[in-house]
Amino acid sequence: SSAASDVYKRQVLGKAYNPLYGWYVSSKHALEGWSDVLRLEVKQFGIDVVIIEPGMIKTNIGNYSAQYFEKYSKNSEYKNFYGSPDDSNENTFDDYSDPIVIAKVIDKAINAKNPKTRYSAGAYSWILLTMRGILPDKWFDRLIVNVTG
């Protein structure tokens, strides 16, 4: 059992990505690299660094972002990525996981005697990470573009 654990929520978007979320995805890539290095640096002190990889979780970030996408992209070449103003956003989160799913995984990681390096949980996390790992980049790009816009 380690003396302590540092747990970081990274989001699947650190490995998978969506158009118009470059600002968010880049921060998750940075957290991924930093966590990997930190894990090596603090292991000697008995500290485990654990990364939580949430899938699609019911939060307000999508609605919040959509306001800005529409405002700043509606007359640009990028408008096809956020949809038309008539597109309904009501059912977007129906199949997303509740945040409690991630809280339970964090609890599991903190209380594990020998925690895994990474835990994934939530809607689409497993499938996105698996697809990202097995598909060539251009195929995955095409999949993302077909799904998002």
Report residues per predicted region.
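Non-catalytic terminal and boundary segments that flank Rossmann-like NAD(P)-dependent oxidoreductase
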Residues: K138-G149
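Active-site loop immediately N-terminal to the catalytic Tyr-X3-Lys motif
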Residues: A16-W23
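C-terminal beta-strand-loop-alpha-helix "lid" module of Rossmann-like NAD(P)-dependent dehydrogenases
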Residues: Q44-F93
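Active-site segment of SDR-like NAD(P)-dependent oxidoreductases
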Residues: R10-A16, G55-M56
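Short, small-residue-biased leader/transition segments that mark boundaries at the very start
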Residues: S1-Y8
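Core catalytic loop region at the nicotinamide-binding pocket of NAD(P)H-dependent oxidoreductases
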Residues: V49, D87-G133
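Active-site helix of classical SDR
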Residues: S27-A30
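Active-site-adjacent segment of SDR/Rossmann-fold oxidoreductases
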Residues: A16, V37-I47
